[in-house]
C-alpha cells in the first residue's frame, strides 16, 4: 500500500494499515514534509503507549511497517495507492496522471477526496476501472467510517477488494456513488 501525502490525513490513513500489519510507503515530494509526517505518526503511537493502549514493542513493530519516499517511481509495484493531498481537482488530477504512468497494471488508484467528483479524477487516467474513492474521516486512525466511492467505470473487483480491505483495517465501509459530499458530509452539512 502507498499513501500520497504525509500530512494529518495521510498519516492517519497510513496508521490504519500499519495497525493491521500491512506495510505502507508514504510519498511526499519534500523530505522535510515526509520526516514531519513520520514523526507525527511516531508521536501518535507513543501517546497511545503512554496511555497503555500499546506496548513499546507494538509501537516499534508498527513504525517498522512504514517507509517513506520522495519519488513516484518507488510506487511502481504497490497494489493500492491512496491519494491524500490538497482538496483541489487540479492537484488530484496531476497526482493521478502521474500514478497512471508509474503504477503497475491492475493497481487500485484511490482518492481520499471528501467532495470532488471521482469520475472526473478517473477520466484523467487510462484505467478508470481501477479508480475509486476511499474517503476516510478525520482523524483517519480513529474514525470508523470509510466511504467507498464507486465511480462510473470502477470495476466490481476493485469495489469488492476495497470493501474487504475496509474490514481488514477495522473500518465500517459504506458503498456510495458519486454525488456532492457523498453520504457522511451530506448528513453533517445541515448542522
Regions found by a protein language model. Give the residues of each.
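Rossmann-like NAD(P)-binding element
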Residues: 32-36, 47-109, 115-119, 124, ...
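Internal alpha-helical scaffold of NAD(P)-dependent oxidoreductase catalytic cores
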Residues: 148-179, 189-191
Amino acid at each position: 500500500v502507498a499513501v500520497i501525502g504525509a500530512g494529518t490525513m495521510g498519516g492517519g490513513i497510513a496508521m490504519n494499515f500499519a495497525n493491521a500489519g500491512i506495510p505502507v510507503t508514504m510519498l511526499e515530494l519534500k523530505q522535510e514534509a515526509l520526516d514531519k509526517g513520520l514523526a507525527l505518526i511516531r508521536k501518535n503511537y507513543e501517546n497511545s503507549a503512554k496511555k497503555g493502549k500499546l506496548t513499546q514493542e507494538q509501537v516499534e513493530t508498527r513504525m517498522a511497517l512504514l517507509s517513506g519516499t520522495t519519488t513516484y517511481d518507488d510506487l511502481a509495484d504497490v497494489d493500492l495507492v491512496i491519494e491524500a493531498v490538497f482538496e483541489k481537482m487540479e492537484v488530484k488530477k496531476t497526482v493521478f496522471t502521474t500514478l497512471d504512468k508509474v503504477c503497475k497494471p491492475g493497481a487500485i488508484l484511490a482518492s481520499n477526496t471528501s467532495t470532488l467528483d471521482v469520475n472526473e479524477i478517473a477520466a484523467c487516467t487510462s484505467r478508470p476501472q481501477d479508480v475509486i474513492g476511499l474517503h476516510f474521516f478525520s482523524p483517519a486512525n480513529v474514525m470508523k467510517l470509510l466511504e467507498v466511492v464507486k465511480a462510473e467505470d470502477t470495476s466490481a473487483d476493485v469495489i469488492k477488494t476495497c470493501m474487504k480491505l475496509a474490514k481488514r483495517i477495522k473500518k465500517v465501509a459504506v458503498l456510495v456513488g458519486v454525488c456532492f459530499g457523498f453520504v457522511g458530509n451530506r448528513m453533517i452539512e445541515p448542522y
